[in-house]
Structure formats: C-alpha cells, structure tokens
Regions:
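Extracytoplasmic
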Residues: 49, 59, 100, 109-111, ...
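Short beta-strand edge/turn micro-motifs at domain boundaries
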Residues: 113, 128-156
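Surface-exposed, charged secondary-structure patches
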Residues: 63, 67, 75-125
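Bacterial N-terminal signal peptides
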Residues: 4-15
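Sec/Tat-exported extracytoplasmic proteins
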Residues: 39-50, 58-62, 66, 88, ...
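Positively charged n-region of N-terminal signal peptides that target proteins for export
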Residues: 1-4, 20
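Short, low-complexity N-terminal intrinsically disordered segments enriched in polar/charged residues
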Residues: 17-52, 56, 60, 78-79, ...
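A short local loop/turn or secondary-structure capping micro-motif enriched for an aromatic residue
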Residues: 64, 73, 122-124, 138, ...
Length: 162
C-alpha cells in the first residue's frame, strides 16, 4: 500500500505546484489595473449618461444579465449593452451613480473577471445594492466588457459609501 500512496503523492505533486502558481499569479498586475480602469470609466459614463464613453468599453455583443426578485424567486433579465445604454441615458429617467468596492480581479491571458459590491444611488440616495460580476476580454489590445451580471436587493445596503 505504501508504494501506491507514494505514487499518488508523486503524481499529485505537479498539480499542487501548478495550483500554487495559479494562486500566485492572481497577485495584482498591470492587467488588473487596466481591467479596473475600464470598469471605472464605464461606470463614469453611466453616472454622466455618456453613452459614447460607455460604448468605448463594451464589446458590440456585450450583454447584461440581471437577477431580479420575482414572486417565485429570482428571474433573469437579459439586455444588450445597446438596450441598457439607451435605457439609462433617457432624459426622463434619473441619472444613476453605481460605485463599486472591494473588487476581486482575476486575469488569465486575455480573459478577466471582476466580482464587486455595488450601490446604485439616485439623487444621492441609495436605491439598491448587490454584487456585480464583470467579464472582460482583451480585444485588439483593449479590455472590453463582454457581460455584466448582478444581484439586486433594496434592504441592507447601508448609507451611501464615501
């Protein structure tokens, strides 16, 4: 039995080293900063209703996957980025401010994901909060948002963040 255990541990060795390398590569890099800058600029466009700025940071096929409460539990709403930008830039709708905090960024080559808390504020008051999950790809040397998924709740959001 001992030779079998030794063989198993030896076989596991490269996988353990590979997993350790993957964890170490999760340390912040220039790509992490670029990904966050892309998201921050997109959210600045949201805050100022600047559809040109928002569009600069999304792929033409980008989607928003929104989980919203419904009578039988969460329901999924899908919007194209174009539909979303039209909706949030309408002059008859209040401007939205959606800061994020505590982002967790993962980058592997040309693919990135970011998980972060968010608050949506309307006229300085917290409307709702939850978590955003962004997926981005580096296309033509630029990070582009492919998808934003979020959760939604109206309670437990706290005061507006600084």
């Amino acid at each position: 039995m001992r030779p079998t255990l030794l063989a198993f541990l030896l076989a596991l060795g490269p996988a353990a080293v590979s997993a350790q390398a993957a964890v170490e590569s999760a340390a912040p890099t220039a790509a992490h900063a670029e990904v966050l800058a892309t998201i921050d600029s997109f959210l600045a466009g949201l805050r100022t209703r600047d559809t040109m700025l928002m569009a600069r940071h999304v792929d033409t096929l980008a989607r928003l996957t929104l989980l919203r409460p419904g009578p039988a539990g969460s329901r999924v709403m899908l919007l194209s980025a174009a539909q979303f930008m039209r909706a949030v830039s309408r002059p008859d709708q209040p401007a939205l401010d959606e800061p994020i905090r505590n982002p967790v960024v993962h980058v592997d080559g040309d693919l990135a994901s970011v998980w972060a808390e968010y608050q949506v504020r309307i006229e300085g008051k917290v409307s709702h909060c939850g978590f955003d999950a962004f997926h981005l790809a580096r296309l033509g040397g630029q990070w582009k948002i492919l998808n934003v998924s979020d959760t939604f709740r109206r309670t437990g959001c706290g005061d507006p963040w600084p």
